[in-house]
């Protein structure tokens, strides 16, 4: 328990935080997303470069956090990179080469949904790289990142942490949801039986790559809503951006046409079918059906009232 200045005990939410209230979450998320728009405007105007690395356990909430970060950003200057398995040509290159090609130019934000740290995680655990390649990566990654930072890139690295119990629950949710089942890969399922191997790989990765110029920040992600608020808030607090006030553009008045242009007849165009009209038709039918169902109920209620009143009058007469 924590204490207020007046000595009153308060629950300590840092160890076992409760689920975030939905309304409070949505309100704060909108505020932070508005700030992200300001951040992007500053990046574009100043020519800054931002790289955000999102790593963590499978189903830890990286993807949903990225979705909220980019929801209102201009995709022309903010993009997500989720590189597939390297092809034969990429396997013959320097390991970092294919990631260098995806780095931002001036005025861009790039979010890596998994990154060069695949080598320290899945490749290490599943045996997709040799021990020599793995050790070389741990040596070169800090050097590579120092070069990025020295060149002026704002580099942020986040590790989304989730418990094994919560991960299983999320896997089960994905399995039961046809719309999200594609997110459950064979590699995800194998990670269940290799939990401790991944834990050791993560610990080793932190030891070698958590450097002052590019530190790791852990995001507690048992509650996805809480993790989204926390990671966005941290990102905004660590980049020294300023809100750039730009004059609002004026929407011009469309002048009256002075030409003899006449739009071609509607039937000359090919339109997609208006299947949405069926939704409105169904709504109207349901409303009419509900009205018809109410009428007999009202009639039955009136008859019942009449019977009660007539029964009451009869009783009074018998008393006389």
Curated annotation (Swiss-Prot):
Any GO MF annotation of the entry: polyphosphate kinase activity
Reaction catalyzed: [phosphate](n) + GTP = [phosphate](n+1) + GDP
Family: Belongs to the polyphosphate kinase 2 (PPK2) family. Class I subfamily.
Catalytic activity, EC: 2.7.4.-
Record's protein name: Putative GDP-polyphosphate phosphotransferase PKK2A
NCBIfam families in UniProt: PPK2_P_aer
Organism placement in taxonomy: Bacteria, Bacillati, Actinomycetota, Actinomycetes, Mycobacteriales
Family matches, as InterPro entries: P-loop_NTPase, Polyphosphate_phosphotransfera, PPK2-related, PPK2_PA0141
Keywords for the protein's UniProt record, in alphabetical order: Kinase, Transferase
Pfam families: PPK2
A single GO BP: phosphorus metabolic process
Disruption phenotype: Deletion of the gene does not affect significantly the cellular polyP content.
Stretches the record annotates as Disordered: 1-21, 246-267, 281-320
SUPFAM superfamilies assigned: P-loop containing nucleoside triphosphate hydrolases
Chain intervals with Basic and acidic residues compositional bias: 12-21, 281-290
